[in-house]
Amino acid sequence: MSQVNTSQGPVAQGRQRRLSSLSEFNDPFSNAEVYYGPPTDPRKQKQAKPAKINRTRTMSVFDNVSPFKKTGFGKLQQTRRGSEDDTYSSSQGNRRFFIEDVDKTLNELLAAEDTDKNYQITIEDTGPKVLKVGTANSYGYKHINIRGTYMLSNLLQELTIAKSFGRHQIFLDEARINENPVNRLSRLINTQFWNSLTRRVDLNNVGEIAKDTKIDTPGAKNPRIYVPYDCPEQYEFYVQASQMHPSLKLEVEYLPKKITAEYVKSVNDTPGLLALAMEEHFNPSTGEKTLIGYPYAVPGGRFNELYGWDSYMMALGLLEANKTDVARGMVEHFIFEINHYGKILNANRSYYLCRSQPPFLTEMALVVFKKLGGRSNPDAVDLLKRAFQASIKEYKTVWTASPRLDPETGLSRYHPNGLGIPPETESDHFDTVLLPYASKHGVTLDEFKQLYNDGKIKEPKLDEFFLHDRGVRESGHDTTYRFEGVCAYLATIDLNSLLYKYEIDIADFIKEFCDDKYEDPLDHSITTSAMWKEMAKIRQEKITKYMWDDESGFFFDYNTKIKHRTSYESATTFWALWAGLATKEQAQKMVEKALPKLEMLGGLAACTERSRGPISISRPIRQWDYPFGWAPHQILAWEGLRSYGYLTVTNRLAYRWLFMMTKAFVDYNGIVVEKYDVTRGTDPHRVEAEYGNQGADFKGAATEGFGWVNASYILGLKYMNSHARRALGACIPPISFFSSLRPQERNLYGL
């Protein structure tokens, strides 16, 4: 946006400025709720004030102004507005359009430009890339052209959003549809996407939140809530919600005190949402107290629950947008899950009760604590203490206990309990694995699934297959050839880096907030900060012994069953930097040797092509392998490299990732997806692996993006200076941007 000239002389500065047109008090970049709200409805404006909407003054009018009124404008360049010039530069982006009929314009736009009929306008569409729209000054009588994929796709998005607000006519600022893409994407993430992804349980929305699109069985047709056995207030709340909305057929059930793998399997056919933390609210109109859930964010797409490690990544982005209440709510929910379900769950559905996800609670609680005001806020201190108490319980009872702990190495593995076939996968996901067993027993595939789940057919090899499959899903990296058939036996660098971080964080917490003495309410044991630091030191030594490969510069996973270090080159090696467990020498070798193997056009690949191996019909591509890149890998690597003094490398990697996201956003109708192909410069969002790409299936306008990808964009921009931001806005590829830099500027990117 242009800068306002404030040095216009004493008369100009002292004179009260008169609002002469609508554009002077309407923000073209305001939230959709404001921009398309009732006050901006053209039909209402016509009734109240039928003339002179956003009248642009010509030079002839200005020349007739008295010398007194010209005071302070002497430094402004006077340019005449061309009567037929419809270029952006001629108007400086200040024009406004009048869309007399939103539906009609929307249909005309799609008919002319959406040639592949997917309700999006992209560079792959072959339309004329131009559309005439009416001017606001003439109330649509005169027309000008909107040109190009980016502006037309933004017009489609704005018309779609306006229609969703029930608008039939709109004024539309040119600046809104030709906004710098970096600014537009940032604005949408902070003001729209986070709001669309935020959930908060109340009496009126329980049924909608409880719906599950991942499972299609007779028992899953009705929404269902499972409540911990010791939460009677919540049980009564959900029963009340069910009674208030009988048409929803909401079912409410208590969970048993002891949750076993057998119990979890028994309710796979009747899955339900698991209750989360709630707080009391006082209703001033009724004088009654009621429960309401703490807010939380969901990843998006088919993932409509509170997820484990997604929530930490999203919390970082939410805090940047000052949505502290949502980030804080997710910490509350994790405390609740540990206290009532025994662990931070993969997600809050009944079929996830045996399965956790990568642990980030200590760091998550710390960043929320700081945002809440730290020690100066008693509520923040209370939250931190409860979060660390829960984290210590999780550390002891989940990650350093059987079956996840390997007693010989002292390292931990993704090794969840569970029985049967995971029900949340696509119905045919395991068919190729199960078909030989069905043939062996002379039954159909569906019959075999039922017999196996019921325990009437025993197949030890199949049991082991699903043990590792559940481990893969607990790791958050579902799926990858890195873990296939071995996950539960692997002491991974990612998990053990996180546990090292837990140990360091807990040591600091005990020293700072517990007078260096912590009594665990679980087992009444007493620990000090020195004891936790010693545990961290021991883990660090074991990680180096079993996982570090000096020659390659990678931390590799260690197979505890065959007692052998693997050689799968994964981006999770940089988690050792994020956790702070690597030595300076190890960090240097990682940057010199490991990084070049993983750094691609669009950032870090999940693994190297060599490690992934060949792809064929019988060996299909996996989404957590090369050539795909994921937001959490970028976020943790950026912070890890920065903390070890490699900020310039972080700048380079962040530019690559942000370029890829921005390019897809500009060329493909504002798309933001779960993962990207970091080797592709044209359509990196196009991922044909497993269940496709969440965030790509929308009509007209993307309203959610994808949780941790949204966060990665906002976090990545913190590493960009103004020069880099301008280059991103112009979609300049990394190779062109880096090669055009002066020598001193190249140093900023580790080149």
Swiss-Prot record:
Site annotation BMH1 binding: residues: 55
Regulation of its activity: Activated by calcium. Activated by protein kinase A (PKA)-mediated phosphorylation.
Result, substituting residue 120 to A? Decreases catalytic activity
Outcome of substituting residue 135 to A: Abolishes activity
Q: Which domain of life is it from?
A: Eukaryota
Where in the sequence does UniProt note compositional bias of the Polar residues kind? 1-10
Residues bearing the modification Phosphothreonine: 58
This protein's record includes keyword Metal-binding: yes
**Residues binding Ca(2+), per UniProt:** 114, 116, 118, 120, 125
Q: What is the effect of changing residue 21 to A?
A: Abolishes activity. Abolishes activation by BMH1 and BMH2
Q: Which protein family is named in the record?
A: Belongs to the glycosyl hydrolase 37 family.
Q: Subunit composition? A: Monomer. Interacts with BMH1 dimers; the interaction is direct and activates NTH1. Interacts with BMH2.
Q: What is this protein called?
A: Cytosolic neutral trehalase
Q: Which organism is it from?
A: Saccharomyces cerevisiae (strain ATCC 204508 / S288c)
Q: What is the lineage of its organism?
A: Eukaryota, Fungi, Dikarya, Ascomycota, Saccharomycotina
Protein encoded by which gene: NTH1
